[in-house]
Amino acid sequence: MQQRDAADQAPGNLFVLSLTRVTQVDRDPDWVFRRLHDPETLLACVPGGSLTRVIDAERFEGRIVVGAGPFKFGYDGDGRITESDPAARTASLRLHGLDVRHVPDVRIRMSMAVHGHSSGSEVQMSFWVTVVDRTGLLNRGWVDPIANDLLDRTVRRIKQELEGTTGDRPA
């Protein structure tokens, strides 16, 4: 589902997207939560993503390269786990690309919930993505498919990574 209530603003454009995805993983829910709570595991599942530095238990830095055709944008940024409840298996985090001239500013808030499921775990993820394009070159026709494709590929990689790793299988 996408939110389309953002208006174009001069100079440049503001885009706000609200995206959700659900996937099932053939692993124990507590194990899945612990793995997804690790920034290195999570960023490794983002195409073009990598962890560059762990600051402390809640803060980290990373890099994500996003491409569309021949164009690529590299984002260095910081992340912070803003909420975590291991008993409920819920967590939230915030990612922010560092300001770079001539590159759209991107901020992401993500929340996840891991529930028990007949196949092991169900992972529900919600993303709120804000893109500020100061150049005025981007339009929603480019932003929506790029964001959706990146998220779809991330969710597929989460499932593949977790199911391809030795871990607790459901009873």
Residue ranges and their predicted role:
Residues 16-22, 59, 74-76, 88-90, ...:
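Intrinsic-disorder/low-complexity, polar/charged segments enriched in Ser/Thr/Lys/Arg/Asp/Glu/Gln
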Residues 83, 97-148:
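Beta-strand/loop substructures that line and gate deep hydrophobic ligand-binding cavities in soluble
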Residues 132-170:
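A conserved amphipathic terminal alpha-helix motif
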Residues 2-4, 8-19, 65-68, 78-80, ...:
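Extended beta-strand/beta-hairpin segments
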